[in-house]
A protein has these predicted regions:
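Sequence-specific dsDNA recognition surfaces
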Residues: 4-17, 22-56, 190-194
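Residue-level recognition of specific faces of alpha-helices
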Residues: 70, 123, 128, 148-151, ...
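A short glycine-rich beta-alpha junction/loop motif
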Residues: 64, 78-85, 117-140
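Non-catalytic DNA-recognition/assembly elements of restriction-modification systems
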Residues: 1-17, 131-147, 154-194
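A short beta-sheet element
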Residues: 50-52, 59-104
Length: 194
């Protein structure tokens, strides 16, 4: 393990869409879910003012109001808000599959909040974010960590789907049968609680 700065293993991806935006998914801050490492929402269409490009595998970091902990890996190429910093792994220094988990962690967000400027809508710049220091293992261990973390993320998502399905089942079993009943004229006495 060695201590590295984020800017030694990743760069800010700076690419601008100068032509037609048709066909590119659009990502705004509202699409980044706090504390989620994967991007699951975006808009389609070209009716926006965004011009910042990102590529599949880049990490999209919500630089405005960093305390909201918004950062996710892009599953496709697209265009994003100027309030998103696009971070690209340097593959011979850090495994690109591990970078999203390095970014999406409390210590990095605490660092980002401490380096943010502005009172109403504080923003952190890449120039400050790139100085975040962390321990980084060798490539073999990075691969092991990435596999484990992605497996944990998949398990978490499966669990969330199970909870949602269970919630729907409970609603259908208890609320559904009562939805078509006529309760007019049937009242229960009310008591005042002190």
């Amino acid at each position: 393990m060695c201590k590295v700065k984020l800017g030694e293993v990743a760069i800010e991806h700076k690419e601008t869409c100068k032509g037609n935006k048709d066909g590119y998914p659009i990502v705004g801050l509202e699409h980044l879910v706090p504390e989620e490492v994967t991007l699951t929402a975006w808009d389609e269409g070209s009716d926006n003012t965004f011009t910042k490009m990102f590529r599949k595998g880049n990490v999209l970091f919500g630089r405005r109001r960093a305390y909201l902990k918004k950062a996710a890996v892009a599953p496709f190429d697209g265009i994003c808000s100027g309030d998103i910093t696009v971070i690209e792994a340097i593959p011979d220094r850090i495994l690109p599959e591990l970078l999203p988990f390095i970014i999406q962690n409390d210590e990095l967000f605490d660092f980002a909040v401490g380096k943010s400027a502005g009172s109403l809508s504080p923003r952190v710049k890449w120039e400050h974010l790139k100085n975040y220091e962390f321990e980084l293992p060798d490539m073999g261990k990075q691969r092991e960590l990435a596999e484990l973390l992605w497996a944990m993320d998949a398990t978490k998502k499966s669990y969330q789907k199970l909870i949602a399905a269970t919630d729907e089942l409970v609603k259908s079993q208890f609320i559904g049968p009562l939805a078509h009943k006529d309760f007019s004229g049937h009242t229960a006495p009310m008591r005042r609680c002190a």
